[in-house]
């Protein structure tokens, strides 16, 4: 789950991280009111969407008068903001953050992530803040420094000080940087975050260290422990299909391709998408119906996939372990009839009650294309999507 910058800064404040004064605004008049409350002479008007690259897309403006705050708020609020993370369609800006201006001397980068290789939390830092960190990692990997944090001890003073020095924090400002890094770590740990990022971490001309941006992602499996985080959820920023899928306990993620995928098990789902791509196709979604799929869930899965206007074919790939193939077959038949399926459907199933499931599909009268292996299924669905 993602949250907005202003919400991330609320979390950082709770853990003692220095951030500029600012508030969200949902209208132009509210933006002006917030600016007047903050006082000048400089304000930053920021679009609030769940994507990076807002500045390059025109979603962050520096205002030097109340009139400019009004002008920029009017420009940004309601705009379709396109960044490298939104795709060409962009995201509509429904809220702003109005923040006091900052004296920027150094822009640094720090973040915390879970490293699956070391199975530890990793603190990363770079002197190249304010930029796309993926670009820095690709072109100048030597500028990214890492510290492995032991969960049993947390981020030690020496570790924080060492990283701060390596990324260019002046010696006199290292105690401030240490407090921010340790506060960021505590926020990451105590909220079950999967990402906590400050980009940029600013060092001002007088040596003051502040977090000018805040980005958090949270582990959805841990949200039951954090109702205060769930309260931050903004459904306007989420894919409507993914919201609908969550109501039926379906793991669904929209993609850019034209081949729908309905699979049981996340690992098999990813392998299925890889195989489709291997044969020249493009998956339209990730969809895991899980081990307890019912006819209703399969029907809803078909409805979700068919909401994609670019869908050209569907591949159902089932391994019947916990989930029986005859139950899936029943769901496929009911789902196909319920939605008046009008795109080619390829089905491959193996495992428990496989023969019964295949017979049910064959006797259904539906134009289902059967396959015995994942490779055959992928080849057939790619051909079907291409109209061959």
UniProtKB/Swiss-Prot annotation:
Domain of life: Bacteria
Cofactor dependency: Mg(2+)
GO process annotations (BP): succinyl-CoA metabolic process; tricarboxylic acid cycle
Binding site for ATP: 46, 53-55, 99, 102, 107
Protein name: Succinate--CoA ligase [ADP-forming] subunit beta
Pfam (any one): ATP-grasp_2
Subunit relationships: Heterotetramer of two alpha and two beta subunits.
Chain sites annotated for binding substrate: 264, 321-323
Xref: PANTHER family: SUCCINATE--COA LIGASE [GDP-FORMING] SUBUNIT BETA, MITOCHONDRIAL, SUCCINYL-COA SYNTHETASE BETA CHAIN
Source lineage: Bacteria, Pseudomonadati, Pseudomonadota, Betaproteobacteria, Burkholderiales
Keywords: ATP-binding, Ligase, Magnesium, Metal-binding, Nucleotide-binding, Tricarboxylic acid cycle
